[in-house]
C-alpha cells in the first residue's frame, strides 16, 4: 500500500468518525430541544431523571463527543480551538469539558445567556443570518471541483495586499500533515449542529470594508478562535482533498521554480556583466546592463502590487510569465547592445512581477504561523539559484566568448512547462474573467487611478530613469549637452521632492507602497538602511567579479568556484538572524559589533592587489556578503515588526522593491565612478608613452579600445602598455569599493539613528 493509499484510508476513516460525531450531536440537540420544551411544563422528579439518563447514554456511546463534567453548571462557554480539533488523532476526538449546550454556543460564538433567546426565534431569522454573502463567497474557495486559484483569481474578487486569508494548508507542509477540509454548498439552519472548518472567515459589517482594509477577510486565526465566525458545514471526499492538496503543492512548486530561475538569471547578469559589455564593445556602459534589469524589476513589483487591486490575478500571472520567458529568449537572440538592454528590461519586469505575485499568493496558501517556513524554503531556493547560475554559464562558455547567451535560454523551456501547468490549473473551470465590468469594479478602478500609488510609481520611475541616463549615458557628444544635463538634473530633483511629499502627506497614508513616514520614524530609517545596503552590494558584486575577470584573468569556472560560498552567505545570513536573533531584545551592542565587523570587511576590500592569494579570493566577497545579508535580514525583520499590521503581508515585497531601487542607484553611481576613473587614469598613464616614440594617435586608439572592451586588452593590447592598463582597471575597481564602503557607512548610521529613536520610544512608554 502506497503512501497516498494510506493517506486516503486515514481520511476516509476520519470522515466516517466525523459523520458519526455529527449524527450524535444532532441527536443530543434534538433531545435538548425536547427537554427545553418540557421544561415549561411542571415535571416530576422521575421524568427529570429519565431525561438525564438518556443524555448520559448517548454520551457514553459517542467516541468523539465526551460527556459533560457537571450538568448543573451552565456558565460562560469556552471557545473551540480549531487547531486542537484538527490535531487530534484519528482514533480519538477532541476533549470538550463543557456541556453539549455550551458546546453548541461556543461553536456559534454566542454567550450562554443569549443562546436560549436565539433558540426561541423563528428559523427564518437563523437562515437569513447563516446565508451571508461571505459564506457564499467561501463556497467557491471550498469547492474542490474548482482550481485552488479560482476563488482568488476571479475578477470579482481581485487579489490585493489587504485581502490575504489564512489558508488551511501550508504550501510547504509535509505530506503526513494533511488537514481535513470540508465544503458546504447549502444553507444551514440553527437547529442543526455544525463542525467548524479549519479556516472560516470573519463576518464584517459594510462600514468596516474600506478600499484599503482587509474587508471580510480575517486578519489572524485569533479572530476565528474568539467565536466571530459563522458556522457552516463542509462535505468533501478524501480523494478530492488529496487532489486539492496536490494542486496546491504543484502550484507552490511552480512558483518556487520561477524564483530559482529568477535568482539564476540575476546571478548570471551580475557575474558576467563586464564580459557581456566587453563583447558588445560597451564596457564603459557596464552599469547600464545591470541597472536596466534592477530598474525594471522594481517597477514591475510596484505596478503589479497596484494592478492586483483592480485586475484578475490570472491575467497578471499570464503577463508576468510571458514577460519573463520572452525576456530570456530575447537575451539569447540579441545581436546588438540596445536589443540586449531591452531584453533585460523585459526580463526584469517579468521577474519583479512574479516575485510580487508570489509573495501575495503564497500568503493565501500558508498559515500565518507557517509563513516563516515558507520564507525559509524560498530563501534556500533563491540561494541555490544564485550559486548555480555561474556554473550553468560555464557549461556554455566558449573561447569566442559568446556562450553566455545560451545560459539565458536555459530557463525558457522549464518556464514554459511551468506556465502550461499553471494555466491548465487556473483555466480548468470556466470563470468570470471575461465577464462584463460591474459598477463596483469600475468604481474600484477609478479610485485606484486617483490613489497616490500611481503617482508614486510614476515619480519614482522618472527619478530612476533620469538618474540612470545621467550616470550611464555619454551626453558629452550630443548637441546642447549642457541643456540636456540641466533638464535631467531638474527632473531628478523635482521627482525626488514629489515622491517625498507624497510619502509624508497625511492624505496618502494608505498607499500600497507607503513607508508610513508620518506614522513611525523608525520605518524610514530601516528603509534607508536597506536601500543603501543593497547599493553597497551592487557595487562590490559586479565590480568584484570585474576585478576577478579583468585584473586576475580568471576563467568562468574559476569565477563560479570563488562565488560558491555565496550560498552559505545567504542561508547563514538569513537563518542566523531569523531563528537565533531576539528581534525585540536590547541587542544594540551585538548590532554594532556586526555592523562594525562588516564595515571593516568593506574597508579591507579596498586593498585588493594584482596578486591576490587563492584563499583570499574565496573570502574577499563572500564575507562582506555574509555580513550584509545578516544586516539586510535584521532590517527587514524590524521593518515587518514596525510596519502597519494590515500591510504586513506585502511588506516583504516592499522591502525587496526598495532594495532594488537602492541597488539601481548604487550600480549607476558605481558605473559612473568606474568609467570616469578609468578614462582619467588611462590618459594620465598611457599618454606619457609618447615620449618613448609612440604616436599620440596610436595611444588614443589604445585608450579607446581599452575602455570599450577588456577582451581586447587581454588578446590584442601591446605588451608595453598591457600592465599599465591592468593597473588602471585595478584602481578603478578600488574606487568603486570605496564608494561601496561609503554606502555601507550610511547603513550603519541609519541603524544607529534607529536605535536612538527606539530607545526614546521605549523610555516614553515606560514613563507613561
Curated annotation (Swiss-Prot):
Stretches in topological domain Vacuolar: 274-282, 332-334, 397-406, 469-481, 544-562, 609-617, 675-734
Residue numbers of Phosphoserine PTMs: 62, 99, 106, 160, 192
Composition-biased stretches (Basic and acidic residues): 110-121
Keywords of this entry: Amino-acid transport, Coiled coil, Glycoprotein, Membrane, Phosphoprotein, Transmembrane, Transmembrane helix, Transport, Vacuole
Cytoplasmic side: 1-252, 306-311, 358-375, 428-447, 503-522, 584-587, 639-653, 756-768
Role: Transporter required for vacuolar uptake of basic amino acids.
Record's protein name: Vacuolar basic amino acid transporter 4
Taxonomic source organism: Saccharomyces cerevisiae (strain ATCC 204508 / S288c) (Baker's yeast)
